Structure formats: C-alpha cells, structure tokens
Swiss-Prot record:
Species name: Escherichia coli (strain SMS-3-5 / SECEC)
Subunit details: Homodimer.
EC number: 2.8.1.-
InterPro entries: Rossmann-like_a/b/a_fold, TilS/TtcA_N, tRNA_Cyd_32_2_STrfase, tRNA_thiolation_TtcA_Ctu1
UniProt-recorded name of the protein: tRNA-cytidine(32) 2-sulfurtransferase
Family membership: Belongs to the TtcA family.
Catalysed reaction equations from the record: cytidine(32) in tRNA + S-sulfanyl-L-cysteinyl-[cysteine desulfurase] + AH2 + ATP = 2-thiocytidine(32) in tRNA + L-cysteinyl-[cysteine desulfurase] + A + AMP + diphosphate + H(+)
Gene Ontology cellular component list: cytoplasm
SUPFAM superfamilies per the UniProt record, alphabetical: Adenine nucleotide alpha hydrolases-like
Biological process terms in GO annotation: tRNA thio-modification
Pathway note: tRNA modification
Known cofactor(s): Mg(2+); [4Fe-4S] cluster
Gene that specifies this protein: ttcA
C-alpha cells in the first residue's frame, strides 16, 4: 500500500470517528430535550456556514437510522448582500436531493439604511431574519425550526449576558417563539465548535462567508469567543466544566428570589440541599468535571456503537 493510500485510509478513519462523535452529540441532545418527534417536518435553516452545513449533514444521517419518521426541508434566506453567490446553495442541495426553499428578502438594504456606519448590525439583522424565518416555517408547514448554534455559542451567550446584560441567561437548546406558534431547536447544542470545524474542512462544504456581520471588528461576541478559546488552551477542560454547570443549576445557592423562596426559610423548615456547606471549604476535583483528555475520548469513541437513537 502506497503512502498516499495510507494517509487517505487514516483520514477516512478519523473522519468516520469524528462523524460518530457528532452523531452521538446530536442524538443525545435530541433525546434529552425531545427535539424531534414522530411526523415532524424540520425546517433546517441553512446560512452557508460550517455550522448549518454540519447540522444538515448529521440530521440527514440520523434520519436514515432513527426509529421515528421525520422530514427535512432546507431554507436559506438570501439577504441580498453584495457578492452573495446565489448559485452555491441550490446546486449543493440539488446534488444531495434535499428539498429546499430560497427566500429572497433585501434585509441587507434595510440594515444599511437604519444602522449608522461603524455600528454593529447584528441585533437588527437577527430580528429581521427571525421574523422572515417564522413566516416561512408557517408557509412550509414546518413543525420545528432547526438552528445551527453549538455548545460554544451557548457558552458565549451566557457570558455575554453576565458581562453586559446582568443576567444568568444562555441560549436554550429548545424554545417556544414569543407568539407561541413555533418551536425552535438547536440540535448541535452538545457539539464542540472545533469538531464542527474539522468536520466541515474534511467534507469540503462550499462555505459562504457573511460579509455583513463577520467583517465587523471588536464585536462583543467575538471578544467573549476569544476569551473562551484562550481559556480552553490554557486550562484544558474548563469549557466542558462550564457547560456542565449550565446543566447542574442549584437555585438555593444563587440570589434569585424568583427561583428560590429564601424568605420561606425559617426555623423548622426542611434542610436545603447542601445549605450548610456554605460554611465549609469547597472540595474541588483535581480534574474538571465532565472532561477527559483527547486521547481517552478517542479511545472511547472506538468502543461505542455507531447507532444513535432519536426519541
């Protein structure tokens, strides 16, 4: 066997292993939050970025082995940005044989008209985009709207709200729209951005950059993203631990009186879970909770079956 064949074989092995991990992450998120149910019609929002391409690919893959029936329709919003390659997504989706719809709305022109030069456009752009996608979901008869946000996006949102909004608020894996008509799901909620990036590179998706928001310097989200990436490099496992913390909230040890009845604690009350530990030194584990070295993780992947059950 030639050296090139050996490299190709190794690359394919690594790609299969990576895809299994992403399948497992997505399958677990779907099961944990009951994202997809029998007969669902999922509107997959496809921007042309690595995240949405990966989401569509993994959902298509799961669709073949899932114990329930659900359909997919890919939707792209053409916002009329200058230089947007209109042919890329239709050609890609037709090659896959995926049902799709391209929605054309000049939100770019509205944003440029309303937002002064130098100001960030993300807020208005996202509001306009959200309204159009909700309308499109109704027109298509979609029961769920799938967005491509991943674990890193969720953590970034948590820190953005803490640093700038004064709220302990993240980005939920599943939510009901404000009008109560649409359910939004984020199947990549458990997926790492670096895994998605590696998968997108290996699959050579035809990436379309966002020239409107991606080119804006000093965005608050970008500052947070850089901070988290730096933490991940310097303190391996910290990202995993922080995400685990979002899944293990103890309301009695925070300060929100809407979440816990502090006034109701009186003599004779039941013991609050872990309440008296406030006097003791915290026992901190030697390794971050929910984290294991890359090598161990890869070995575990080899032992797992390539089957993800969608409930």
């Amino acid at each position: 066997m030639s050296q090139n064949q050996e490299i190709s074989k190794k690359e394919q092995y690594n790609l299969n292993k990576l895809q299994k991990r992403l399948r497992r992450n997505v399958g677990e998120a779907i099961a944990d939050f009951n994202m997809i149910e029998e007969g669902d019609r999922i509107m997959v929002c496809l921007s042309g970025g690595k995240d949405s391409y990966t989401m569509l690919e993994i959902l298509r893959n799961l669709q073949q082995s899932a114990p329930i029936n659900f359909s997919l329709v890919a939707v792209n919003l053409d916002q009329k940005q200058p230089g947007f390659p209109e042919h890329v997504l239709p050609e890609y989706l037709e090659t896959l044989g995926v049902e799709y719809k391209i929605v054309e709305e000049n939100t770019y022109g509205i944003v440029k008209e309303k937002i002064p030069e130098g100001k960030t456009t993300c807020s208005l752009c996202s509001r306009l985009r959200r309204g159009i996608l909700y309308r499109t979901a109704t027109e298509l008869g979609a029961t769920k709207i799938a967005l491509g946000h991943h674990r890193d996006d969720i953590l970034q949102t948590l820190f953005l709200n803490m640093f700038y909004g004064g709220k302990m608020k993240g980005m939920p894996p599943k939510l009901m729209s404000d009008d109560g008509k649409h359910i939004v799901i984020r199947p990549l909620a458990y997926c790492r951005e670096k895994d998605i990036q590696r998968f997108a590179d290996a699959k050579a998706f035809p990436i379309i950059p966002c020239n409107l928001c991606g080119s804006q310097p000093n965005l608050q989200r970008q500052v947070i993203a850089d901070m988290l990436r730096d933490w991940d490099k310097r303190y391996p496992g910290r990202i995993e631990t922080m995400f685990s913390a979002m899944q293990n909230v103890v309301p009695s040890h925070l300060c929100d009186t809407n979440l816990f009845d502090f006034k109701g604690i009186t003599h004779g009350s039941e013991v609050v879970n872990g309440g008296d530990l406030a006097f003791d030194r915290e026992e901190i584990p030697l390794q971050p909770a929910g984290w294991q070295p890359e090598e161990d993780e890869n070995q575990l992947d080899e032992l797992r079956l390539n089957v993800v059950e969608v409930k």
